[in-house]
Amino acid sequence: MLRYAIIFFVIAIIAAVFGFGGIAAGAAEIAKILFYIFVVIFLVTLLLGVVRR
C-alpha cells in the first residue's frame, strides 16, 4: 500500500512540474487538476498504509 502512495506522489510531482512550469495553457490546467487529484489519492493511500500496520 505504501508503494502505491509513493507512485501517486511521484505522479503528483510530475503533474506539478508540467502544471506550474508554463508548458501550454490547456495542458497546464489539466495538470493542475491532476496534481490535486493525485495529492489527495497519495494522502489517502498513505493513511491507509499507516493504519493497516
Swiss-Prot record:
It is found in: Cell membrane. It is a multi-pass membrane protein. The keyword Transmembrane helix applies. GO terms for cellular component: plasma membrane. Keywords: Cell membrane, Membrane, Transmembrane, Transmembrane helix. It comes from the Bacteria. The keyword NADP does not apply. The chain crosses the membrane at residues 5-25, 30-50. Its main location: membrane. Belongs to the UPF0391 family. HAMAP family: UPF0391. This is UPF0391 membrane protein Bcep1808_5731. It comes from Burkholderia vietnamiensis (strain G4 / LMG 22486).
